């Protein structure tokens, strides 16, 4: 994303873009790296950056010999809204998932397990049976995780990788 595009992206995010997802790719090695790039390099106002709900970080993971690399999602962080100038110093980022290199898996953090996600609670507040019931919400997250894992296993077993594409995932949800 370039400066003019970044400003347009954040304007769409701030106004809600008719309640649709507004997403962009911004290169940064961490949530703070994304913030720094958006605010300092692309000149998006700090108040506009607060329209960001989450930052997903993908990075290559290398083999010990350095000859092989695999791209992995290594961090999923929520952006809180209560900070004023520096989201890192003011605890404006909350990690919900972190990559475990030993297991080659993305794992939930204690914050996610304990229900410290304003985004997920906001979504849950509009679902009967989930509003105010973090255990039900988290159980559903775990169930969906098992379903996605099974889809991957079936896709590998049958070599039908269309099962992993958005069209099928939309239907399977």
Whereabouts are the PLM-identified features?
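Terminal-proximal interaction/regulatory segments of ATP-powered molecular machines
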Residues: 128-173
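A hydrophobic alpha-helix/topogenic segment detector
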Residues: 36, 46-48, 64, 167-169, ...
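Conserved P-loop NTPase
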Residues: 54-147
